[in-house]
């Protein structure tokens, strides 16, 4: 619509069309996104009158990075296909990793069992019945050596989903790389290391916020000096969404956490451009196709603007929001699990069209158990078909310029900014966590969504509509109970054969350092090289830092 006369004519045409449509029958159901954002029946140039191409879109690889963080995106290379995997002991998971790499996977992603996540060794009383169940059991450097046996760590990047004990697990990985003859400057990968979203959503915390943030800034500083290819935090919206948030809440709360980490790094005396380039993100890909695409585009623009204008970042790499995506586990159904293949495909496609840097596609059986080899192969093949057969990777940001996509991207950005203002008024992210703001927002959103499903206002195929009485006939992966016994026995033998004087000295040095402002990463690295266990290190740090206790919120 180029001039006032044309605009008047177009408005007249639009009004006539609206009158015609308003008298037509409508199919039942609400016309909103999954998150409840109302959708117009038609989007036109009038919805983008305030859009400034250069300021709001630009070109791929250029500020504000709405259209992607690389100049040539998938014309250069495909996203990293990184299937999240881990179960049993290190031997079991090593076999799965090597199988996935043989099948064409291009990166690794480690799932740890609950005892490892919570900082307990496999022989701890609280680990009983949980060893190797929901991920791989890692007690010491010895397990890490087995986990990556015959996998050269200078040739593959690894993402590790670990938070409370992230510094310890990371040091085990670095020590293992050095044992392979790989220099720290060559090691690439990611640790999740996002403790704020633990307080908000996943609840797998160990230490209180202040010492937890201290460990994170220690990692930022050590990596900047010694491990330059490592992504030090994967700021995670995935778990926030899985807990029941809307897409807008996932966007806003994740970026708010990111800003809090930037502020913590700066407060620790670090220049923003020394650590911000190695911050990465982890988003959910849910089923509302266009809402998810717009979420990713808005995230890149918001991050770039805030890092530049609010935090004074000058290195273009600091402004680029790079992210991993996982399809939505909460969208999968136990009923008719084969339907989950279709759900995962749609979600994966939205992540690709939204410009993800790496992707995990859930397996159809993950709602029932850890995935079988067959199921995980289908999930990987889903990515490969999208990459090599669909053609969607041949054009960079192909949905740019769509009136609907650009309008929804703008709307999500505006709603996220409104959340930032509310969080700021509460005193920042930590204060908002303490008063239960995030937790209440997520709980309310989850309740409203479930109500809509229960009332059939939201259709879930095979669950509340088009459902069958047939029970699924599907093979499930079962963890051998003997895994726990074997892991405990290996741990006992490790404690007998290691140099326990060296372990004691290393742990004592760590205890002394933890009571000062000294960077703890070198001390932890020394301890794990002596084969101190994760549980031993966590127990020591609990003595110094204490443990977190959440206030009653509901």
Can you describe what each PLM-predicted range is?
Residues 1-286, 291-292, 310, 317-324, ...:
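Catalytic alpha/beta active-site cores
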Residues 2, 18-50, 58-66, 114, ...:
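Flexible, glycine-rich loop/tail regions that form catalytic "lids" or insertion modules at the edges
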Residues 77, 123-126, 153, 196-199, ...:
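Short acidic (Asp/Glu) and glycine-rich catalytic loops that position anionic groups and cofactors
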Residues 87, 96-103, 141-151, 172-176, ...:
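Generic, well-ordered alpha-helical scaffold segments in large soluble proteins
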Residues 94, 170-171, 248, 293-297, ...:
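Conserved strand-to-helix beginnings and helix N-cap segments that scaffold or border functional pockets
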Residues 129-133, 198-207, 240-245, 283-288, ...:
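Short beta-alpha connecting loops at secondary-structure transitions
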Residues 139, 157, 162-165, 177, ...:
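Phosphate/diphosphate-binding loops
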Residues 271-275, 313-327, 335-364, 371-396, ...:
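Flexible glycine/proline-rich, aromatic-decorated loop/lid segments
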């Amino acid at each position: 619509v180029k001039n006032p006369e044309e605009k008047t004519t177009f408005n007249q045409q639009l009004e006539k069309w609206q009158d015609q449509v308003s008298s037509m029958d409508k199919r039942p159901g609400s016309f909103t996104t999954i998150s409840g954002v109302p959708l117009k029946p038609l989007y036109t140039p009038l919805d983008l009158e305030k859009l400034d191409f250069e300021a709001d879109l630009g070109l791929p690889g250029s500020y504000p990075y709405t259209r992607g963080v690389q100049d040539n995106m998938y014309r250069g290379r495909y996203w990293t296909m990184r299937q999240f995997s881990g179960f049993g002991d290190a031997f079991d998971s090593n076999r799965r990793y090597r199988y996935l790499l043989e099948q064409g996977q291009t990166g690794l992603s480690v799932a740890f069992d609950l005892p490892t996540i919570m900082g307990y060794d496999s022989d701890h009383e609280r680990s009983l019945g949980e060893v190797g169940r929901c991920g791989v059991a890692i007690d010491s450097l010895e397990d890490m050596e087995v986990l990556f046996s015959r996998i050269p760590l200078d040739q593959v990047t690894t993402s590790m989903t670990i938070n409370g004990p992230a510094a310890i697990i990371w040091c085990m990985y670095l020590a293992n790389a050095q044992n392979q003859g790989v220099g720290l400057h060559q090691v690439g990968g990611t640790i999740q290391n996002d403790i704020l979203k633990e307080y908000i959503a996943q609840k797998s915390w160990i230490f209180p916020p202040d010492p937890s943030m201290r460990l994170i800034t220690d990692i930022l500083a050590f990596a900047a000096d010694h491990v330059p290819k490592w992504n030090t935090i994967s700021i995670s919206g995935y778990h926030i969404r899985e807990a029941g948030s809307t897409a807008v809440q996932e966007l806003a709360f994740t970026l708010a956490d990111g800003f809090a980490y930037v502020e913590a790094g700066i407060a620790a005396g670090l220049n923003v451009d020394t650590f911000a380039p190695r911050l990465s993100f982890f988003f959910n890909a849910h089923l509302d196709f266009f809402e998810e695409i717009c979420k990713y585009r808005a995230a890149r623009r918001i991050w770039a603007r805030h890092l530049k204008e609010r935090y004074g970042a000058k290195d273009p790499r600091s402004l680029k929001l790079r992210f991993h995506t996982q399809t939505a586990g909460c969208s999968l159904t136990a009923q008719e699990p084969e339907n989950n293949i279709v759900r995962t495909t749609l979600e994966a496609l939205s992540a690709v069209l939204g410009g993800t840097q790496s992707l995990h596609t859930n397996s159809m059986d993950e709602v029932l158990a850890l995935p079988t080899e067959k199921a995980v192969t289908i999930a990987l093949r889903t990515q490969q078909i999208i990459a090599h057969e669909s053609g969607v990777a041949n054009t960079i940001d192909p949905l740019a310029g769509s009136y609907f996509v650009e309008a929804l991207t703008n709307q999500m950005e505006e709603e996220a900014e409104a959340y930032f203002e509310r969080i700021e008024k509460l005193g920042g992210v930590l204060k908002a966590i303490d008063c239960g703001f995030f937790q209440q927002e997520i709980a309310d959103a989850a309740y409203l969504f479930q109500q809509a499903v229960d009332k059939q206002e939201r259709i879930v195929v095979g669950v509340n509509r088009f459902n069958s009485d047939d029970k699924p006939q599907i093979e499930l992966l079962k963890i051998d109970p003997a895994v726990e016994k074997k892991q405990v026995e290996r741990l006992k033998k490790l404690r007998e054969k290691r140099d326990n004087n060296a372990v004691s000295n290393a742990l004592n040095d760590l205890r002394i350092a933890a009571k000062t402002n000294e960077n703890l990463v070198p001390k932890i690295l020394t301890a794990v090289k002596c084969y101190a266990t994760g549980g031993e290190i966590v127990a020591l740090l609990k003595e110094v830092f204490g443990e977190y206790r959440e206030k009653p919120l509901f």
